[in-house]
């Protein structure tokens, strides 16, 4: 094809591409692909058969934490931190050392705290619609995020030998080997001895966990992992943050599919112990209903941790490829304290529906919000019945986490001209 013909073709495509915007008209997230002859990204609509497990009775895990007959973790000693304790002659010492930023959390069970979570935490890439966060994981943790989620894929269309954090396809967004990101988390945990962090690994290819474990161990993070005494863990089985901190078991790790807690008791099976509201939500009402695991009874759901997915999406279709992208034009509203579609309203609705607040508010671009940046932390504090300090430092916000949609046809023009295309 001649250059003039290519230019004509690209020019003709531009209106078509621009017409692909969907709801929330100001949203302008774009996909930029790299590599040659990339396979078309596909979205799994259902996991493999047998992916969800249920248990008629608890299994005691070998090598797990010591526990009482009631199933609660026991520990010796107190959270003694020198100058961070105050005491009088007539009262017991009073702890003033915060756990996960709040003194009140130290004596609360892990299952009785609402954390702010970063949906697709590793996916930080300016100008790429595969991104879900603006600030890297160290900044996320510094600002108060205590739940991190990321999807694992094998690069090279599944032929790679090192698992990476990738968004649907490693040709869409490749955040690198999993041990790099996990190593950053481990380094942060090293420096913050009074914080408990939860990591949810998405098993994008439904691989056997034995393929991931060596790379998880390579990061050094396993020295901090929490090993539960039972499978599954009910709400009352969880220890307090203070107990976890005293034992140095300050990283809770889940795998969404194909977990094997018999072999790896610390890599916990998510859906036998946690349920989630609808994933990739496109409804601003954010119904607080159980989507995964399917067919979970309300009685069973009330005795599990739960994640409130509050990352609003739109579906973007271009050249036959369907992508879910963040509704960035509504980020401040979605991550706001009050109002239609806000995380604060949704958390309160969940609390009313289930009699307790969500354990995780899972959001995109956590540092956006209203009435101020980082309002998601104030929303979490409200349902935790603690007071958020607005003077806490929080990451700066750039002009926008996206690239304007008018440049999409230019991107595809470059792909066509340079021989990069999607097959």
Protein language model regions, located:
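Catalytic cores of phosphodiester-bond hydrolases, prominently lipid phosphodiesterases
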Residues: 2-8, 15-398, 404-422
């Amino acid at each position: 094809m001649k250059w003039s013909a290519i230019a004509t073709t690209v020019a003709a495509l531009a209106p078509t591409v621009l017409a692909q915007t969907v709801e929330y008209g100001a949203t302008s997230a774009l996909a930029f692909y790299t590599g040659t002859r990339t396979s078309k990204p596909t979205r799994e609509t259902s996991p493999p058969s047998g992916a969800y497990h249920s248990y008629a009775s608890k299994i005691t895990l070998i090598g797990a934490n010591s526990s009482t007959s009631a199933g609660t973790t026991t520990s010796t000693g107190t959270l003694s931190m020198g100058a961070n304790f105050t005491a009088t002659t007539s009262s017991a010492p009073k702890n003033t050392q915060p756990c996960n930023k709040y003194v009140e959390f130290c004596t609360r069970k892990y299952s009785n705290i609402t954390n702010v979570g970063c949906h697709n935490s590793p996916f930080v890439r300016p100008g790429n619609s595969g991104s879900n966060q603006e600030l890297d994981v160290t900044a996320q943790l510094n600002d108060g995020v205590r739940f991190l989620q990321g999807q694992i894929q094998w690069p090279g269309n599944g032929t790679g030998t090192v698992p990476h954090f990738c968004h649907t396809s490693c040709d869409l967004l490749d955040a690198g080997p999993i041990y790099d990101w996990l190593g950053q988390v481990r380094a942060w945990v090293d420096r913050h001895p009074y914080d408990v962090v939860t990591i949810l690994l998405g098993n994008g290819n439904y691989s056997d966990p034995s393929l991931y474990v060596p790379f998880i161990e390579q990061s050094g993070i396993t020295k901090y992992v929490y090993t539960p005494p039972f499978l599954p863990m009910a709400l009352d089985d969880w220890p307090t943050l203070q107990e976890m901190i005293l034992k140095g078991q300050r990283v809770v790790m889940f795998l969404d599919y194909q977990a094997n807690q018999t072999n790896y008791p610390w890599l916990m099976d998510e859906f036998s112990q946690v349920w989630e509201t609808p994933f990739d939500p496109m409804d601003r009402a954010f119904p607080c209903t159980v989507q995964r695991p399917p067919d979970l009874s309300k009685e069973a759901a009330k005795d599990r941790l739960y994640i409130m997915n509050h990352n609003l999406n739109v579906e973007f279709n271009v050249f036959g490829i369907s992508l879910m992208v963040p509704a960035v034009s509504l980020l401040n509203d979605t991550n706001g304290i009050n109002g239609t579609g806000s995380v604060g309203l949704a958390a309160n609705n969940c609390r009313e529906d289930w009699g307790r607040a969500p354990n995780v508010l899972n959001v995109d671009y956590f540092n956006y919000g209203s009435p101020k940046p980082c309002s998601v932390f104030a929303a979490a504090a409200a349902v935790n019945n603690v007071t958020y300090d607005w003077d806490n430092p929080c990451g700066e916000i750039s002009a926008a986490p996206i690239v304007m949609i008018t440049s999409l046809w230019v991107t595809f023009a470059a792909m066509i001209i340079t021989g990069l295309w999607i097959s």
